């Protein structure tokens, strides 16, 4: 099995990249893909860049170039669930766009025309993530992750998301675009991210301070999932 791993930013991929054995690098269109092995598992690690377009472009390149069997989206997220604190883990059961609106034509909020209302994560990958959470004894929440081309920093956008998507546990900028591409290619995916900030008016300050914590925690999770895959 080959596992595709996607992070948007340098800080979100650097720890995993350093753990890749027999590493080779592929660069195209502003994206970087690092291939090799972690814990004996073949991996292809993508640094996509920030936002939905960069994520979709990079994911397409990853799937075409490296042909992974599954995809894990890692990195940081803003917490929406009240039980989440910096460093805690979120695992997607589904993802939606929070900034797509074609409701005038009968679609649900966040649903893109011609697409499912939500993109469902793979149950087997979710189960592996939950096993890793138990092993590492981390606080985690499973649920809806929402994505859009905005860093949520303020009461008004936060209130809009909470009102429109009351079940959302976290918000970030790439996961749904990644899931959208995986859906088109019929490749199973899961989002496993760590909380860098609680989405509020000071979230930009928290993000700058705690991104490294989120990167460390999400890396621990990905490594634990890979170790479980290697043992099977």
Curated annotation (Swiss-Prot):
GO MF annotations in UniProt: adenosylhomocysteine nucleosidase activity; methylthioadenosine nucleosidase activity
Pfam families hit by this protein: PNP_UDP_1 (PF01048)
Residues at the active site: 12 (proton acceptor), 197 (proton donor)
Enzyme Commission number(s) of this protein: 3.2.2.9
Pathway recorded for this protein: Amino-acid biosynthesis; L-methionine biosynthesis via salvage pathway; S-methyl-5-thio-alpha-D-ribose 1-phosphate from S-methyl-5'-thioadenosine (hydrolase route): step 1/2
Keyword Hydrolase included in the entry's annotation: yes
Keywords: Amino-acid biosynthesis, Hydrolase, Methionine biosynthesis
A GO cellular component entry from the record: cytosol
Catalytic activity, reaction form: S-adenosyl-L-homocysteine + H2O = S-(5-deoxy-D-ribos-5-yl)-L-homocysteine + adenine; S-methyl-5'-thioadenosine + H2O = 5-(methylsulfanyl)-D-ribose + adenine; 5'-deoxyadenosine + H2O = 5-deoxy-D-ribose + adenine
Annotated substrate binding sites: 78, 152, 173-174
Keyword Hydrolase: yes
GO biological process: L-methionine salvage from methylthioadenosine; L-methionine salvage from S-adenosylmethionine; purine deoxyribonucleoside catabolic process
Broad EC category: hydrolase
Family statement: Belongs to the PNP/UDP phosphorylase family. MtnN subfamily.
Record-linked HAMAP family: Salvage_MtnN (MF_01684)
Subunit structure, as described in the record: Homodimer.
Known function: Catalyzes the irreversible cleavage of the glycosidic bond in both 5'-methylthioadenosine (MTA) and S-adenosylhomocysteine (SAH/AdoHcy) to adenine and the corresponding thioribose, 5'-methylthioribose and S-ribosylhomocysteine, respectively. Also cleaves 5'-deoxyadenosine, a toxic by-product of radical S-adenosylmethionine (SAM) enzymes, into 5-deoxyribose and adenine. Thus, is required for in vivo function of the radical SAM enzymes biotin synthase and lipoic acid synthase, that are inhibited by 5'-deoxyadenosine accumulation.
Protein name: 5'-methylthioadenosine/S-adenosylhomocysteine nucleosidase
Provenance organism: Pectobacterium carotovorum subsp. carotovorum (strain PC1)
